[in-house]
Curated annotation (Swiss-Prot):
This is Pentatricopeptide repeat-containing protein At4g14850. It comes from Arabidopsis thaliana. GO terms for molecular function: mRNA binding; nucleotide binding; poly(G) binding; zinc ion binding. The gene is LOI1. Belongs to the PPR family. PCMP-H subfamily. The keyword Acetylation does not apply. Residues 483-558 are annotated as: Type E motif. Acts as a regulatory factor of isoprenoid biosynthesis. Could bind RNA.
């Protein structure tokens, strides 16, 4: 070592950076101190400053700088660059201005580091000052300086300044165009990003993987399927179809555009996959409501030892929430704890949402309370959980903590959807109308179709069907399927067939192929005893070739899902299930229970109607749960359609008769049956 020259020592310091070896760096520094004159040559001092700052030892880097009498712009830039690279943005700016106090002029490498620090700290005024200095020093025309200044303006939300600077850059390179396109997407301006890409191609620009990914994000945000497919063709022609990041972008794009089969094909044909690839397809499945596939893929990724991220876990927790997969959700929660990501904002919010949608509101509250940091999504998730349970008082209490009344975040569009849904399910008409009116007057939020639908649903549940119709007629926007559907359901519940027919006609115009609309109208006529019209609607449904979606109920026992259909006799325990149901019916009839036959769909004799409703899928699932689950465990049933009136009455009676807690999640809300009472208070 004693024979090593200064150049060789400098090379060793570069190797220390490449190998991320602080030990090697310190050994070389010790050799420099021992063998060379003090202070070392300026270029060697600069190597030392660069090594310490890049390896995230800022104090050592600053000390070497202070002990170097002949420090120059390279010395300062080495320090500032390393500080910015390692996230010490405030310190980087302090050193930048200290350099200026010493009269050192920044160069083409110093300015980008300073702009990066300003962008990260969101300091627009400081950014403008440094921009002015770059102009004064004649550096702003450098493509790298100009690009970093442009990026700074974008990240500090100074759009006009960013656009002006972009137009003034004389020679835009690929990085400049990438910065423009990427920042336009990040800033919520996908159309501008697409227009920039088209202009870039017009001047014969050649995109790289960053360009392709940014453009795909723009197409995803704008849901522009055709344009994205054209880009996919360009990806193939340009040879980027083997690039992992581009393939990941394509998976995400097709998923958001509801082309999940295309996402699957790209994933399957990828030669090399990374953790983002798996995560992208899981998220795509969730976005397309294919929750079971998302869960299966997640379990496959665990077997393949794919690195787990907080985004992956939050995505699969959303899948568990969608299919009410409580057991799987709990196991993923345990994995999140093991991976030390359960308290991140993404995973924490997903846990709050998952437990709320699985009917475990206490677990949802606990996950919420244990989060060190909460944002608007977290609060909306808990309010949504309360809404599913019809706990309007708890939802309103959490809402009161938000701005402007409280110190929490300001409510947004989705906050009010959950609040109004809670009011609807609890029958809190007065509160619901006050909240709806406050959206514009207090919060400046324009109500959307979901909010109007909640109000119609709320009024309809409360029996104010005519008022709900008058509300629809006064809507400033065109009523949607959900609005007319809420009115039609209210007509079914309260025996208003003529108004129900009007709602159905509007539904048929908006979505003529949805079998649910025809079934609901048929039920409305059946509830009013107008059997001929009910059967006519059913026959029309068959005549146009529209098939009614099958109703399913399922229950999980010992990590195995058991699914049932109405009149299903295929289960291995069918004999025991039928015996249990018959026994329960006999006990209940002896106690005065009579089946609710008003919504039986056919003009049958009373005995036939009773047989019709006695084998609904949720009753079969309940009987199986009573046979299979211990007394201390609640019976949790999920149904893909709304629970019928007779099953609702049956479940209330059973919960009191056998002293079991029964939790049913249908396609509308949760029902917690206990001691003969339902949490919905018969509003559903």
């Amino acid at each position: 070592m004693s024979l090593l020259s200064a150049d060789a020592l400098g090379l060793l310091l570069k190797n220390a950076i490449s190998a991320s070896s602080m030990r090697l760096g310190r050994v070389v520094h010790a050799r420099i101190v021992k063998t060379l004159d003090s202070p070392p040559p300026p270029f060697l001092a600069n190597y030392l400053i660069n090594m310490y700052s890049k390896l995230d030892h800022p104090e050592s880097a600053r000390l070497v700088l202070r002990l170097t009498p002949a420090r120059n712009v390279v010395s300062w830039t080495s320090l500032i660059s390393g500080l910015a690279q390692n996230g010490h943005f405030s310190t980087a700016l302090v050193e930048f201005f200290e350099m200026r106090r010493e009269g050192v002029v920044p160069n083409d490498f110093t300015f980008p580091c300073a702009f990066k620090a300003v962008a990260s700290l969101r300091l627009p005024v400081t950014g403008k000052q440094i921009h002015a200095l770059a102009v004064k020093c004649g550096r702003i025309l450098d493509v790298f300086v100009g690009c970093s200044a442009f990026d700074m303006y974008c990240k500090t939300r100074l759009r006009d300044d960013a656009r002006k600077l972009f137009d003034e850059i004389p020679e835009r390179n690929l990085e400049t165009w990438n910065a423009f396109i990427s920042n336009s997407v990040t800033d919520g301006r996908p159309r501008e990003a697409i227009e920039a890409f088209i202009e870039f191609r017009r001047i014969d620009g050649h995109p790289n993987s960053i360009t392709f990914c940014a453009f795909l994000n723009a197409c995803s945000d704008w849901l522009h399927l055709n344009l994205g497919m054209q880009l996919h063709g360009l990806v193939l022609r340009s040879g980027f179809d083997t690039d992992v990041s581009v393939c990941n972008g394509l998976i995400d794009f097709y998923g958001k555009c509801k082309q999940i089969r295309s996402s699957e094909i790209i994933f399957t044909e990828m030669g090399t996959k990374n953790a983002v690839s798996w995560c992208s397809l899981v998220a795509a499945y969730v976005q397309n409501h294919e929750d079971e596939k998302a869960s299966v893929l997640y379990l496959r990724s665990r077997k393949d030892i794919v690195e787990t991220s907080d985004f992956m876990i939050s995505s699969v927790l959303s899948a568990c929430a969608g299919m009410a997969g409580l057991e799987l959700g709990r196991s993923i929660h345990a994995h999140a704890v093991k991976a030390c990501v359960e308290r991140t904002i993404f995973v924490g919010s997903a846990l709050v949402d998952m437990y709320g949608k699985c009917g475990c509101i206490e677990d949802s509250e606990q996950a919420f309370d244990e989060m060190p940091e909460k944002n608007l999504v977290t609060r909306n998730s808990l309010i949504g959980g309360y809404a599913h349970q019809g706990q309007v008082d708890m939802a309103l209490a959490l809402f009161e903590e938000m701005a402007p009344r409280g110190c929490g975040p300001t409510p947004n569009y989705m906050t009010f959807v959950s609040l109004l849904s809670a009011c609807s399910r609890a029958g809190a008409v007065e509160n619901g109308m006050k909240i709806f009116d406050s959206m514009r007057s207090t919060y400046g939020i324009e109500p959307g179709a979901e909010h109007y639908s909640c109000i119609v649903d709320m009024l309809g549940r409360a029996g104010m069907v005519e008022r709900a119709y008058e509300f629809i007629k006064k809507m400033p926007i065109q009523p949607t399927i959900s609005v007319w559907g809420a009115l039609q359901n209210a007509c079914r519940m309260h025996g208003k067939p003529q108004l129900g027919l009007l709602a159905a006609e509007n539904l048929f115009k908006l979505d003529p192929k949805d079998s649910g609309n025809h079934v609901l109208l048929s039920n409305t006529f059946a509830a009013a005893g107008r059997w001929a019209e009910a059967n006519t609607v059913r026959e029309e449904l068959k005549g146009v070739g529209i098939k009614k979606g099958a109703g399913y109920s399922w229950i999980t026992v010992k990590n195995q899902v058991h699914a049932f259909q109405a009149k299903d006799r295929s289960h291995i325990l069918n004999k025991e299930i039928q015996t249990t149901l018959a026994k329960l019916r006999n006990e209940m009839e002896a106690a005065g229970y009579k089946p609710d036959l008003k919504l039986s769909l056919y003009d049958l004799e009373e005995e036939e109607k009773a047989a019709e409703v006695s084998h609904h899928s949720e009753k079969l699932a309940l009987a199986f749960g009573l046979l299979s689950l211990p007394l201390s465990v609640p019976i949790r049933i999920t149904k893909n359609l709304r629970i019928c009136g007779d099953c609702h009455s049956f479940f209330k009676f059973v919960s009191g008769s056998v002293k079991r807690e029964i939790i049913v999640r249908d396609n509308n809300r949760f029902h917690r049956f206990k001691d003969g009472i339902c949490s919905c208070k018969d509003y559903w």
